[in-house]
Each structure stands twice: as structure tokens, then as C-alpha cells.
From Swiss-Prot:
Positions bearing carbohydrate: 5, 11
Keyword NAD set for record: no
GO molecular function annotation: bile acid:sodium symporter activity
Gene symbol of the encoding locus: Slc10a1
Membrane topology: Multi-pass membrane protein
Identification of the protein by name: Hepatic sodium/bile acid cotransporter
UniProt catalytic activity: estrone 3-sulfate(out) + 2 Na(+)(out) = estrone 3-sulfate(in) + 2 Na(+)(in); cholate(out) + 2 Na(+)(out) = cholate(in) + 2 Na(+)(in); taurochenodeoxycholate(out) + 2 Na(+)(out) = taurochenodeoxycholate(in) + 2 Na(+)(in); tauroursodeoxycholate(out) + 2 Na(+)(out) = tauroursodeoxycholate(in) + 2 Na(+)(in)
Chain positions with Phosphothreonine modification: 330
């Protein structure tokens, strides 16, 4: 379907001056500062030797790339068919599905106690791979949805900029950990406090900028699609890595990397490809998708943290039981003079080789 033959649904129009207001500029600057701080903090948790190991044995990276560019685009395409979405709706979802992994995956991997070295390597490789995979996937899956040429709309400069904003602060963090480790706790604490404060500012500015415009994309089928896509990524990423027998830490990492998409790139493509009168409220679909990414990611973190609190209690019960059994046996052994102070007492009357004292005497 040609873009110029499609009209914006709901007679939608963007807020006046959208994208050029002072609040828009402030939001963009804050998001950049947040990303740099997060990547710097995450770099302080990484080790160069472990990063190099993931390149020498790239099993986890390959699985993640397959999950990212195999599962997510196919899921987006199938969901568009299942929910009978319009051409523009299906295209907006497909662009999100073909985007590389987002930087939020690194932060959520840290919260899920995943492999941070693998996470950063995966994000970097995913972005590099996007330079070729995004135009190819958009060309393949958009056939029958959109008659225009999407492969020329891929924001290559945006992808390269996102790589720079990941690699440079991470490299600084790795340097600090290896050469100035005494600074690392201060960097992590300051980064956490500043990031939390900026998150509040981002929330307030986003509400001011978008207002009630996002309500236009909260239709039942778009809500269902934007909730199922990240969930599918989280679930299938974990299952795929489990099938290849990766350790639990790597499974959680690949799960987060697969489920989180770079919605900023999706917004850029939609903005470049379609004028507002064509894309209409679907301009805000990436924001809706990001909300569900965050909500589902936080839900998985809560479930995982609850699991960690329950699991040690079971282990502690076993330890306490064994300790109690040893304590009950010790007084009796002391009375008989058979306790040596280190090992649990043996059965009375038996020597270590299984013969009683009478048999030994004979």
C-alpha cells in the first residue's frame, strides 16, 4: 500500500510545534546524559578478559543474534497477521521488530544478575549487525504491506551514534575498574542517584510532551500486540539459550537482550518515512511498546528477586537440620569418649573399618 494513499486514523494531528519545543530539547539532552551515565556505570562492572572470551567463544553472542533477528521480526509479522492490523499499523510494529537491541537491556540485565560482559558485547554486535540486517529484514517482511522502499530509510547515522554512546563510556568504566578500582564504588553510587533523579525528570517531560496523544494508539489490538511482542522476546530468548545449554546467567542476559528493542531507531524510521498526516497516532506506537517493555521487564525482575529470597531459605533449612543433627549426636559421643572434636562420632563399638573392639582384640 502506498503511503500517500493512507490517511491518518482518528483525524489525528500532532501537538503544535511537536519535536521543536523547549521541553523536547530538554528531554533529548536528559536522555543522552542518562545513557552515558548508565553505560559508564555498567562499564565499571565489566572485565576486558571476559569480554575477549565472549569473542573467542561466541556461542552466546551467536544465539543472541539469531534470537534478535530471527524471533523478533517474525513475531512482529505474525502478530500483524493474527490481529488483522492495517498496513500502517503492521508496518510500525514490523519496524520495531526489526530494530536492534536497546540499551535498556543492559540495565535490566544488571538487575537480573546476568552476564554484563555478554550483555554489552551483544548490544554492540546487534547494532553492528543492524547495519545490514535491518534493510534486509524490512525488505523481506514488508512485501505485501508497503510498496515503498524502506531499506533506504534505515538511520545508519543513528545506529553508529548509538554504538559510540555505548562503547566510549563503557571503555572508560572498564579502564576505571582495572586501573582505578577505588573510584568504582563512588561512580556506581553517583550514577545510580543521578539516573534515578533524571528518570523522574524524563517521566514528567514525557507526560508534558505527549499529553493525551498516546491514548489514540491504545486500541485493543495495538495494546495486545505491543504487550505480546516483548513477552515473546523475553520467553523465546530464554528458551533458545536453554536449548543450547547456556548457564542461567547467560540465559537471563539473552532473554533481556531479545525482548528489549531500540525504540528510538523505530521512531526515527517512522518519522523519516511517513509524514504526520499519514502515520497519524502510530507515531507514538514505539512509546507504547517501550512502556510494555519496561513493565514486563520490571515484572520479571520482581519474580526473579522473589525467587532469590525463597531459594536461600530452603538451603538454610537443610544446613540448620544437619547442624542440629550433629549437635544432638555430640553430647552422647562426649559421654562415651568417642568424639575427636572434628568428625561426627561413629557408631558405638565400631572401628573405622567396620569391626567392633572385641573382634579387633581377637
Amino acid at each position: 500500500m502506498e503511503a500517500h494513499n493512507v490517511s491518518a486514523p482518528f483525524n489525528f494531528s500532532l501537538p503544535p510545534g511537536f519535536g521543536h519545543r523547549a521541553t523536547d530539547t530538554a528531554l533529548s539532552v536528559i536522555l543522552v546524559v542518562m545513557l552515558l551515565l548508565i553505560m559508564l556505570s555498567l562499564g565499571c562492572t565489566m572485565e576486558f578478559s571476559k569480554i575477549k572470551a565472549h569473542f573467542w567463544k561466541p556461542k552466546g553472542v551467536i544465539i543472541a543474534i539469531v534470537a534478535q533477528y530471527g524471533i523478533m521480526p517474525l513475531s512482529a509479522f505474525l502478530l500483524g497477521k493474527v490481529f488483522h492490523l492495517t498496513s500502517i499499523e503492521a508496518l510500525a510494529i514490523l519496524i520495531c521488530g526489526c530494530s536492534p537491541g536497546g540499551n535498556l537491556s543492559n540495565l535490566f540485565t544488571l538487575a537480573m544478575k546476568g552476564d554484563m560482559n555478554l550483555s554489552i558485547v551483544m548490544t554492540t554486535c546487534s547494532s553492528f549487525t543492524a547495519l545490514g540486517m535491518m534493510p534486509l529484514l524490512l525488505y523481506i517482511y514488508s512485501k505485501g504491506i508497503y510498496d515503498g522502499d524502506l531499506k533506504d530509510k534505515v538511520p545508519y547515522k543513528g545506529i553508529m551514534l548509538s554504538l559510540v554512546m555505548v562503547l566510549i563510556p563503557c571503555a572508560i568504566g572498564i579502564f576505571l575498574k582495572s586501573k582505578r578500582p577505588h573510584y568504582v564504588p563512588y561512580v556506581l553510587k553517583a550514577g545510580m542517584i543521578i539516573t534515578f533523579s533524571l528518570s523522574v525528570a524524563v517521566t514528567v517531560l514525557s507526560v508534558i510532551n505527549v499529553g493525551n496523544s498516546i491514548m489514540f494508539v491504545m486500541t485493543p489490538h495495538l495494546l495486545a500486540t505491543s504487550s505480546l511482542m516483548p513477552f515473546t522476546g523475553f520467553l523465546m530468548g530464554y528458551i533458545l539459550s536453554a536449548l543450547f545449554r547456556l548457564n542461567p546467567s547467560c540465559r537471563r542476559t539473552i532473554s533481556m537482550e531479545t525482548g528489549f528493542q531500540n525504540v528510538q531507531l523505530c521512531s526515527t524510521i517512522l518519522n523519516v518515512t511517513f509524514p504526520p498526516e499519514v502515520i497519524g497516532p502510530l507515531f507514538f506506537f514505539p512509546l507504547l511498546y517501550m512502556i510494555f517493555q519496561l513493565a514486563e521487564g520490571l515484572l520479571f525482575i520482581i519474580i526473579f528477586r522473589c525467587y532469590l529470597k525463597i531459594k536461600p531459605q530452603k538451603d538454610q533449612t537443610k544446613i540448620t537440620y544437619k547442624a542440629a543433627a550433629t549437635e544432638d549426636a555430640t553430647p552422647a559421643a562426649l559421654e562415651k569418649g568417642t568424639h575427636n572434636g572434628n568428625n561426627p562420632p561413629t557408631q558405638p563399638g565400631l572401628s573405622p573399618n567396620g569391626l567392633n573392639s572385641g573382634q579387633m582384640a581377637n
